[in-house]
Amino acid sequence: DISDLMIPQGSVVGVVGNNGAGKTTFANNLCGLLKTAKGCMSMNGKTYMANQRIKTCYMVMQDVNHQLFTESVMDEILLSLDNSDEEKAAHEAESIMESLHISEFRDAHPMSLSGGQKQRVAIASAIASDKQVIVFDEPTSGLDYRHMKKVAENLRELSSLGKTLFIVTHDPELIAECCNYFVFIENGKVLWSDGWNRISRERLQRFFAFEGD
């Protein structure tokens, strides 16, 4: 139940709140994945209704196993590209794999990779889709600190491409590493939204201190 929400384009938005607050529902609604999705999203002078948002939004699920479909990493990325020019698509896929350091796995079956490697394949597919809004649902769930840092680096690189990212997360370290705007959800409503400043920092510190008790 969100009447109005403005997000600076190109932001890395941390979507924060307690379990059951409505964060994942918000993410699915944003992407137009819910049959009950309502409202509209405006970006670059265009307005997108619920059934149109799926064309401009891409979701990387918490369990990326649910969105890996092909027999090789290369094919997985090609699936998201325009293949009308096969040579150009292959070149783009190679470039994306190189940027995410997964070129060595180009011929590997995605399901044979580690959790972190699978996630990078999912991120590669998100880049290949060329969609302007990318939503991540708990991208560091189950990852250690080293791999969390790598995910944060990947997210910052994505942001540098001009994408607007929404990160549904309970990970304060990930937030500190890469988020620059925040949406706090409670009981299905946006309680507050803001960039980094003294007030938002104090709010986040109180929330995560309470959550850890």
Predicted regions and their residues:
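Helix-to-loop junction immediately C-terminal to a conserved catalytic motif
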Residues: 31
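Conserved beta-strand-loop-alpha-helix hinge in the C-terminal portion
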Residues: 189-211
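Catalytic Walker B motif of ABC-type/P-loop ATPase nucleotide-binding domains
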Residues: 134-137
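Conserved ABC ATPase "signature" region
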Residues: 88-105
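Conserved ABC ATPase signature
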Residues: 109-113, 117
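H-loop/switch region of ABC-family ATPase nucleotide-binding domains
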Residues: 169-170
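The feature captures the beta-strand-to-loop junction immediately N-terminal to the Walker
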Residues: 16-18
